[in-house]
Amino acid sequence: MLPDHFSPLSGDIKLSVLALVVLVVLAQTAPDGWIRRCYYGTGRCRKSCKEIERKKEKCGEKHICCVPKEKDKLSHIHDQKETSELYI
């Protein structure tokens, strides 16, 4: 005689597979997909930087770390130093 219900383990496996599928779909539909982060989480590894980004360091052999200009801390320090010299 066959059981009328599934074992609890099969329900857990189905839920795990569903969660995995949802995560993969969300990652693929994200604007940057699976792009690796760099420069303390502020940059992204790319083959070439966008116009609004600056090159910072290498990401492996073929990629470079691209940091948005507004998140580049060194550029903000440099800008502040120039403006503070004007007031002296």
Swiss-Prot record:
GO terms for cellular component: extracellular region. Residues 1-27 form the signal peptide. Has antibacterial activity. This is Beta-defensin 115. The lineage of its organism: Eukaryota, Metazoa, Chordata, Craniata, Vertebrata. Pfam families: Defensin_beta_2. Disulfide bonds join C38-C65, C45-C59, C49-C66. It comes from Homo sapiens (Human). Keywords: Antibiotic, Antimicrobial, Defensin, Disulfide bond, Secreted, Signal. GO terms for biological process: defense response to Gram-negative bacterium; innate immune response. The gene is DEFB115. It is found in: Secreted. Belongs to the beta-defensin family.
